[in-house]
Regions:
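Active-site-proximal cofactor/substrate-binding loop regions of enzyme domains
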Residues: 1-15
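Intrinsically disordered, low-complexity, positively biased terminal segments
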Residues: 13-229
Length: 231
């Protein structure tokens, strides 16, 4: 499992009271807000668990479907910079947070206040977001959210040689390893590979055994190596 998500359900009476902060929040149409939302997301994705680079067509498909119309609100700092947004919909007494991103703590507080301002018209708030070990309760004065951790995205190594040559190994002494790979979905990855890692942590990868007898020091399928990379 590469990424997990946290699912939050919060009663309106448990949503934290947030003091007013500088800046403004503007409700915008999808057409008017799309580029700003895209820019904030890209700036924030390095700290966003499960964040990926999204094409414009994918944004339109996931966030602007006619069958599930959304609302958009963007937070602008007192200096006029867009620092956060929330995409949401209200249905059946629930404020559904479709996507919530913020670049600063002030933007988080402003948007939390905006969300909370809907307490009089809904019974609960619901949000599913990437999970990186900490949840929304860590940002609240009094933890009140019901949280479920859900499996989300998996990953695999597509081209072993390219992956290893780009991987940032630790610097140190020069070392050479021999790996035998099994990959039923990518036969180009199968075989015995020799990996030499130099003093700067840069790998050189060639197909073929380092040892004369042609046996690999380590043997596993491709998903095992992907799993080890995340441990």
């Amino acid at each position: 499992q590469t990424f997990e998500q946290a699912e939050y359900t919060i009663k309106t009476e448990d949503w934290p009271s947030v003091k007013r902060v500088p800046g403004t929040i503007k409700r915008v149409s999808w057409a008017d807000g799309k580029e700003v939302i895209k820019d904030v997301y890209l700036e924030n994705q390095r700290a966003h668990s499960g964040g990926v680079i999204r094409e414009t067509w994918w944004l339109d498909y996931t966030l602007n479907r006619a069958s599930k119309p959304n609302n958009q609100a963007i937070y602008y700092s007192s200096g006029g910079k867009a620092e956060g947004y929330v995409i949401y919909r209200i249905a059946a007494g629930t404020f559904e947070i479709v996507e919530w991103n913020y670049l600063t703590n002030t933007a988080f507080k402003a948007l939390a206040g905006f969300i909370g301002s809907h307490s009089g018209s809904v019974q609960s708030f619901h949000w599913i977001n990437g999970f990186a070990g900490k949840d929304l309760n860590d940002l609240m004065p009094t933890p009140a959210a019901s949280v479920k951790i859900l499996p989300y995205m998996m990953a695999r190594i597509v081209e072993l040689q390219t992956f290893l040559e780009k991987y940032p190994f630790q610097s140190g002494e020069k070392e050479t390893y021999s790996l035998e790979i099994e990959d039923s979905y990518g036969p180009w990855n199968e075989g015995i590979w020799t990996i030499t890692i130099d003093e700067q942590g840069k790998a050189t990868v060639t197909k073929g055994a380092a040892e004369k007898e042609g046996t690999a020091a380590l043997k596993a399928d491709i998903q095992t190596w992907r799993s080890e990379e995340h441990t």
